Amino acid sequence: MKKEAIILLNMGGPNNLEEVEVFLTNMFNDKNIITVKSSLLRKLIATLITFSRTEKSQEIYNQIGGKSPIVGHTKKLVEKLQNRVGENIIVDFAMRYTPPFVSEAIERLSDKNIEKIYLIPLYPQYSTTTTKSSLEDFEEQYHLSSGDAILVEIKHFFQNKNYNMAILERIKERVSLEEMSEFDLIFSAHGLPLKVIQRGDTYQLHVQKHISILEQMMQKEGMTFKNIHLAYQSKVGPMEWLKPSLEDKLREIKNRKVIIFPIAFTIDNSETDYELEIEYREVAHEMGYEEYRVCRCPNDSEYFVEALVDIYAKMR
């Protein structure tokens, strides 16, 4: 009997401190991240960046348990989605830069008589640096494996109602309806170099559209904040990136009570557990914030599971 498979794709994160170097090496060798045409030059750049950042990155991961939480959360999500769709559909996941890699997921499917593989990158908004990179990685390796299943892909899902309900649920976990009007809400998105957007990447537009959808949904749910903002985090290097930065936005806001939701991430990782929870909490404290609260990502929430069921159904 022919079967179908759902493969969830994400960037990954170190499963231990030794894998930090693997993570950085693979990420900065990605042609969608370092976009120079010469693979030799890209390798040189990747080596230099990895050498300069490994020790500092290991210190960061050491502060959040010695590893990224992304694989653990994803395993729970896969288990719940598998239970939801039933045993006739195989649900698995693969990471772009750390184990489990795409090659491992393909190997597990090799003797399962798969007719169609549904690829769902866990990035709500499309970007060449994330969605395109993950899809290309799977496509290239699957064709090298001589697989003959049909690959079906989705590019983004920020409009999905159940996914957005998962976001509202996470926000309501951190602040009650009664006290929302005392808080500013910041949707913090992972930043990108401005030149990526200028080349036609739709990420910034998708983030803006996503926030507009969420604002309409919050209004219907009676979720009223003092103000709602967009800011960008995680800038590295000297190039100009999307603005405003999260630090600048925190400095600009007059109200000293703030809720942060990481709008670009579906699964908690170092950018949420360290950068938002620890690093920017210290920044906010130094700025005199009375309240600084960070929402969890959807992770394995029931609404997110239902969103993935929706997405799969619409892809069929």
From Swiss-Prot:
Pathway: Porphyrin-containing compound metabolism; protoheme biosynthesis; protoheme from protoporphyrin-IX: step 1/1. Keywords: Cytoplasm, Heme biosynthesis, Iron, Lyase, Metal-binding, Porphyrin biosynthesis. GO terms for cellular component: cytoplasm. Coiled coil: none annotated. Fe cation binds at residues 190, 271. One of its GO terms (molecular function) is ferrochelatase activity. It catalyses: heme b + 2 H(+) = protoporphyrin IX + Fe(2+). It is found in: Cytoplasm. It is an enzyme of class 4 (lyase). Its EC number is 4.98.1.1. PANTHER family: FERROCHELATASE, FERROCHELATASE, MITOCHONDRIAL. Belongs to the ferrochelatase family. Catalyzes the ferrous insertion into protoporphyrin IX. This is Ferrochelatase. The lineage of its organism: Bacteria, Pseudomonadati, Campylobacterota, Epsilonproteobacteria, Campylobacterales.
